[in-house]
Amino acid sequence: MTTETGIPEVVKASSETMSADGKPEKPNPSMFPKRQKRDTPKEYSYLRCEYKLPHKNHRQCHMQRKAEEKFCAQHVLLQKDSYAGRERVVCPVDPGHTVWADELQQHMYKCNKVKERMQKEREGWHRDDMNISNPEAKPCVGKKSDITVDYAKWIPVVEAAFKDVEEVPVEILNHEKGLAKRMTEVQNKKHALQQASLIAHMEKTGLLKSSSRILEFGAGRAELSRYINYAICAERQQDDKTAANYLFIDRAMPRMKMDGKLVKDTKDDFPEQPLPLIKRLKMDIKDLMLDGVPVEGPYDANLIVSKHLCGCATDLTLQCLLNSAVFTKEARPAALVIALCCRQICNVQMFPKAGIEWLQERGFDDDGFAALTRMTSWVLCGERPKKEPVEGEQTEAADNETPAPVGHPSGLPAEARKVIGLKCRRLLDQGRLHALRKEGLDARLVQYTEMDISPENVCLIVNK
């Protein structure tokens, strides 16, 4: 029903409702009933596979099935081994799907995994496992529980070896020009503060400039490179017309990438400057032959960066650089600034060989290395701090609270385990330093931010 003005009566009535002080009142929710849930399931215009996907919370498969079958071609093997005399077999290239046995030969020409493999073979920068430094080493199998680690044996070894570890100085810096805009855009400044310090450390290397090639390993969305680009633009001289050169490397292709933001920021805030040149590689660092990657434009230095590159990826990156001309044969200067992370997933097969030897000299065999990586997680194993009560806010009864776990297999309280975990971190980092210095590189560690900003607050800096 509508009024003479054409406004629905319900809406007009709600818009004319005023409170005692003359301000309009919010409309009554009962006047706008919620949309009712569908009583019957959604109907599909095709015969849908009846298989419930266990890894998708038992959601029904969306593939089409034949009228005489319950399942689609992918799941028909769950009902019987063959259909009309035809047998389905697992694809030899990708075990994640099946094909008809009599169509296997044709399938090998159109399988997506086969196409990916052929594409990699055509690329000049892909070599399977070339950056795994210790392929002959015994791989770590699965995740070890705390009970399987002999703490009585390995904690004293950690304490004794820690005497050879260098102190990590605190160097918290700030890059005001490059991150000034960023600081005003975010309410939670934790990431911005870390980025500002890392970029300032890059500037100290002397290679934060438009003529450097910026290589971000484990780039993800390339958020760090976005603000590196902004910092370079903010510091650029007026007569500098060199286009900045970026290479992003990640084995995933994340959504909401910021590659375009680098170009947009330059257009909007620095319209007189040349637009950056960007190339993104989707590949695993373990297979990357860096010297084979084509360069987008001229450059006179290499700056390798990453923020919180996980343990295995850090070691693969270091080996990738040592296998390339960047840190060995090239005359161009090079520097590396990486915020370290996730040492609990370091692997003896990927850790620098000279670093493994350094640890072995201090009593860590393969089991000791596994124990070392396991105990690094103790840095974050302390009890979660209790939330401070807010005035006027109800708090749960004490008898409803879940008590913190007690009786850790190591026999140590949380604070003592945290100290041991930090020492294990430093031992792994010292092994990396030893390996890099053995190659003639200038390598050091710094605490680039406070631990309450990020528990992973150590940065590896390398200069050629």
UniProtKB/Swiss-Prot annotation:
GO process terms (BP): tRNA methylation
Gene Ontology CC entries for this record: cytoplasm; nucleolus
Catalyses which reaction(s): cytidine(4) in tRNA(Pro) + S-adenosyl-L-methionine = 2'-O-methylcytidine(4) in tRNA(Pro) + S-adenosyl-L-homocysteine + H(+); cytidine(4) in tRNA(Gly)(GCC) + S-adenosyl-L-methionine = 2'-O-methylcytidine(4) in tRNA(Gly)(GCC) + S-adenosyl-L-homocysteine + H(+); adenosine(4) in tRNA(His) + S-adenosyl-L-methionine = 2'-O-methyladenosine(4) in tRNA(His) + S-adenosyl-L-homocysteine + H(+)
Keyword line: Cytoplasm, Metal-binding, Methyltransferase, Nucleus, S-adenosyl-L-methionine, Transferase, tRNA processing, Zinc, Zinc-finger
Domain of life of the native organism: Eukaryota
InterPro entries per record: Methyltransferase_TRM13, Trm13, TRM13/UPF0224_CHHC_Znf_dom, Znf_CCCH-type_TRM13
Ligand binding (Zn(2+)): 91, 97, 107, 111
Any matching Pfam family: zf-TRM13_CCCH
GO MF assignments: tRNA 2'-O-methyltransferase activity; tRNA methyltransferase activity; zinc ion binding
Region (Disordered), start-end ranges: 1-40, 385-412
Family designation: Belongs to the methyltransferase TRM13 family.
Function comment: tRNA methylase which 2'-O-methylates cytidine(4) in tRNA(Pro) and tRNA(Gly)(GCC), and adenosine(4) in tRNA(His).
The name this protein goes by in its record: tRNA:m(4)X modification enzyme TRM13
